[in-house]
């Protein structure tokens, strides 16, 4: 009887431990964004690339999600966080508060800035057409007013759809996608590890 219990209990404990890791939570958050994009953004209008690693002058940069559309290019950074989130547009560091414990983390807009610059360089386009979008998934709660591009849950879809002015032709969108596909490193586990 004890052996039978252990046969079930040990795998359950292993799965429970895996589900609580930062790696799994990050992976899961990115999958939630993909799922929401699948159902809420027309694939013909908002063409997507996920897990894009580009070579930069100082190494590489990994971008969670890129949506290329006639209305601009949207660069998504996914954050899976719990607790209370405090931060401002101009602050270098934001704060996560969990049960009276404070954790500082880099302003995600600053983190995404490198991604924006890498895409601009790869595509030879100006900053007016590339938009930073920060997506917080998980049970975190904003406790300060956030910039419009910093969203929770599905708010990022509304933010992207708020851009209505056409800035790229279909031919330009296709050409940019081809350029990114050709210039990115293969989306493999080895690439992620090296980055």
Protein language model features and the residues they cover:
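Surface-exposed interaction regions that form or flank ligand-binding interfaces
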Residues: 1-61, 68-73, 82-84, 93, ...
């Amino acid at each position: 009887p004890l052996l039978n219990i252990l046969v079930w209990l040990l795998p359950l404990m292993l799965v429970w431990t895996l589900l609580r890791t930062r790696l799994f939570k990050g992976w899961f958050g990115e999958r939630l964004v993909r799922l929401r994009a699948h159902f809420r953004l027309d694939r013909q209008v908002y063409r997507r690339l996920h897990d894009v690693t580009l070579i930069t002058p100082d190494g590489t940069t990994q971008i969670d999600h890129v949506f290329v559309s006639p209305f601009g290019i949207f660069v998504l950074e996914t954050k899976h966080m719990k607790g209370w989130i405090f931060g401002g547009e101009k602050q270098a560091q934001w704060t996560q508060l969990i049960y009276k414990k404070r954790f500082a983390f880099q302003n995600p807009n600053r983190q995404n800035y490198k991604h924006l610059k890498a895409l601009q360089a790869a595509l030879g386009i100006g900053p007016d057409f590339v938009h930073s979008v920060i997506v917080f998934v998980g049970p975190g709660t904003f406790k300060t007013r956030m910039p419009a591009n910093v969203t929770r849950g599905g708010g990022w879809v509304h933010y992207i759809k708020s851009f209505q002015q056409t800035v790229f032709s279909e031919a330009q969108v296709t050409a940019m996608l081809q350029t990114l596909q050709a210039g990115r490193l293969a989306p493999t586990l080895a690439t992620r590890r090296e980055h």
